[in-house]
């Protein structure tokens, strides 16, 4: 008979004689697992390496996920720790974190026996056993902390009911079963306590570079913040470097998360303030507070960024990020995103980021360059669109003028949109042909942004083109969404981290404003409703008056695909490189990259035909 823990369901408390003896020995201690898997269904042993990545799944910390990645086997090994299991648990993945149409693995009991099986949910949330069992249970055992489940899953399975594990963001889902179910098909996710967590599962397999012997550390931490009892808080804190702090290179950084707050701290960033201001007012409070000094908006140069699930970030051995010294601001802004769905009150936090730096400057300064779209309302997404694409260009003319003859090397990337962004990709093109992807996230979420190290350094030569495309979903909006700085406006940016440092800080584009006005005139001509084209009307006002029928949508989409662009090929001083940058033709691309083909694992036939029955006995808690 299956028994799950101190909160076991009543139907599961009638012990067999052996369990009754165990119960008499251990009293009311938390029940534990000694799992014996059917020998024929035992999988191969997990990799010897530990599980380097770990995140809490739920805000209470009941479920904790660890994992490692084998690129050779194209397999992820998961270790799920369940601290207070009642009658079962489900775990899985879905396109955007929804529990419907999800790829799941479920541990459940019918009150007598326990089962582990690959499953999926339909559009109504009903769970079904998958005909192809691709999650393979390797071990289940008791630990001092709770039940530990070890299982594996290939990246791709060629099962239409399974999620394809790719580079980029993965939306993990979970659910807690509080009572037995006679069958898996009796479970509907709507009746469960559920949630989601975002993470990058396929971390790059990069060797750690050698660190300098004179390396020192600096901690940029929140000053014992009383975390507000609300779901979302962005906390801003201004600090400063010591007087006379000379020029150094940051060579790595890592998160510092206050113990017990692992499920609260969602992501953190350290920004350097603009050197043009001699001082910045000290501040510690919510970033959206009316008390926040306006000057803090000039602290936007990213030094470090961390998100849940990320480990330490290392710069390449030959490069470091410069900070301190002449021409560099002493003032830093720490921003911490607290995700507190349980509205916990009274929790204090001192989380932050630890910088590792050296006075022995490396061969190259690292730099950060902005790719994508200029922050301007001329780039807009019509309402009620589910997959509208906008594209920004860093043209061959700009890279030819601004990059050194030997080019630059991109080693990391941070993608960025506002609330309607769903996909982001940057592609490098050379001689009219797309050559390689710089960074891609087909499941991008604006609520999960981190600097990601690239699996392979991308070299950009003078004359190359960098094309950044963002896909948006405005299905719940009634008006057009225009580009801009506001959270309800949109952005399309890739902050690429590269070396050696150049003067080129921003390489972005937008449609030529004059051609956009021709669009508004065309809309006037072919629609009974008039769109204001008078000079005093702003572009957002003009977009707000467009009747969004199919014709107007298609014409706008076409305009963005052929109209000339205004290029921003800017130095760090925000001044453009010398040249003519308006009315520039779109880069001509004669050959595009092929979409990757799905690989079906050869070991597919070894998977069990049905769920694994788990035989359970008692043990000491």
Regions picked out by a protein language model, each given a short descriptive name:
Residues 300-326, 444-462:
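Beta-sandwich interaction modules
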Residues 1-35:
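Classical eukaryotic N-terminal signal peptides for Sec-dependent ER targeting/secretion
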Residues 26-214, 282-314, 439, 462, ...:
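Extracellular-facing/secreted segment signature in eukaryotic proteins
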Residues 55-62, 203-264, 342-420, 484-567, ...:
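Solvent-exposed, flexible loop/coil segments flanking beta-strands in beta-rich domains
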Residues 267-275, 422-434:
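Short, surface-exposed beta-strand/strand-loop-strand elements in extracellular ectodomains
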């Amino acid at each position: 008979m299956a028994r799950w823990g101190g909160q076991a369901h009543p139907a599961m408390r009638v012990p067999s004689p052996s369990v009754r003896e165990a119960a008499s020995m251990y009293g009311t201690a938390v029940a534990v697992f000694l799992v014996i898997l059917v020998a024929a269904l035992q999988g191969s042993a997990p990799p010897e390496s530990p599980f380097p990545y770990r995140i809490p799944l739920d805000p209470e910390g009941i479920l904790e996920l660890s994992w490692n990645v084998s690129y050779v086997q194209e397999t992820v090994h998961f270790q799920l720790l369940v601290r207070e299991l009642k009658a079962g648990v489900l775990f899985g993945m879905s396109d955007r974190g929804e529990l419907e149409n999800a790829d799941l693995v479920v541990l459940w009991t019918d009150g007598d026996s326990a089962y582990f099986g690959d499953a999926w949910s339909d559009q109504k949330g009903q769970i079904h056993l998958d005909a192809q069992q691709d999650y393979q249970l390797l071990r289940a055992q008791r630990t001092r902390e709770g039940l530990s489940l070890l299982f594996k899953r290939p990246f791709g399975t060629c099962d239409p009911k399974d999620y394809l594990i790719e580079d980029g963001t993965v939306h993990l889902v979970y659910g807690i079963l509080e009572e037995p179910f006679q069958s898996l098909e009796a479970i509907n996710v709507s009746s469960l306590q559920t949630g989601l967590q975002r993470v990058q599962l396929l971390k790059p397999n990069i060797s750690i570079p050698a660190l300098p012997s004179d390396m020192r550390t600096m901690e940029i931490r929140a000053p014992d913040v009383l975390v507000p009892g609300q779901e979302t808080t962005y906390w801003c804190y201004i600090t400063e470097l010591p007087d006379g702090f000379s020029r150094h290179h940051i060579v790595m950084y890592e998160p510092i998360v206050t113990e017990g707050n692992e499920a609260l701290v969602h992501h953190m960033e350290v920004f350097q303030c603009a050197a043009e201001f001699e001082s910045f007012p000290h501040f510690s409070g919510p970033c959206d507070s009316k008390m926040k000094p306006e000057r803090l908006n000039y602290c936007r140069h990213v030094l470090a960024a961390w998100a849940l699930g990320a480990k330490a970030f290392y710069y390449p051995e030959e490069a470091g990020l410069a900070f301190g010294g002449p021409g560099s601001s002493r003032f830093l802004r720490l921003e911490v995103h607290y995700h507190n769905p349980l509205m916990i009150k009274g929790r204090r936090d001192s989380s932050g980021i630890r910088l590792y730096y050296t006075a022995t400057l490396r061969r190259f300064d690292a730099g950060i360059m902005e790719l994508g779209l200029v922050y301007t309302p001329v780039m807009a997404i019509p309402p009620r669109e589910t997959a509208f694409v906008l594209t920004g260009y860093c043209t061959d003319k700009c890279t030819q003028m601004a990059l050194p003859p030997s080019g630059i090397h991109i080693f990391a990337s941070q993608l960025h949109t506002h609330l309607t962004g769903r996909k982001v990709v940057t592609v490098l093109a050379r001689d009219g042909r797309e050559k390689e992807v710089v960074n891609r996230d087909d499941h991008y979420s604006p609520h999960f942004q981190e600097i990601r190290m690239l699996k392979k350094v991308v070299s950009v030569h003078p004359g190359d083109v960098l094309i950044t495309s963002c896909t948006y979903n405005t299905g719940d909006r009634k008006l057009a969404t225009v580009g801009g700085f506001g959270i309800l406006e949109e952005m399309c940016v890739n902050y690429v981290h590269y070396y050696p440092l150049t003067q080129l800080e921003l390489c972005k584009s937008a449609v030529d404003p004059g051609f956009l006005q021709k669009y508004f005139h065309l809309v006037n001509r072919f629609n009974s409703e008039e769109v204001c084209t008078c000079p005093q009307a702003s572009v957002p006002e003009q977009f707000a008056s467009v009747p969004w029928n199919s014709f107007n949508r298609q014409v706008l989409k076409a305009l963005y695909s052929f109209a000339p662009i205004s290029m921003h090929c800017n130095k760090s001083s925000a001044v453009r490189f010398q040249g003519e940058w308006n009315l520039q033709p779109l880069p001509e691309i004669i050959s595009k990259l092929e979409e990757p083909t799905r690989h079906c694992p050869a070991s597919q036939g070894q998977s069990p035909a049905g769920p694994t029955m788990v035989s359970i006995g008692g043990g000491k808690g």
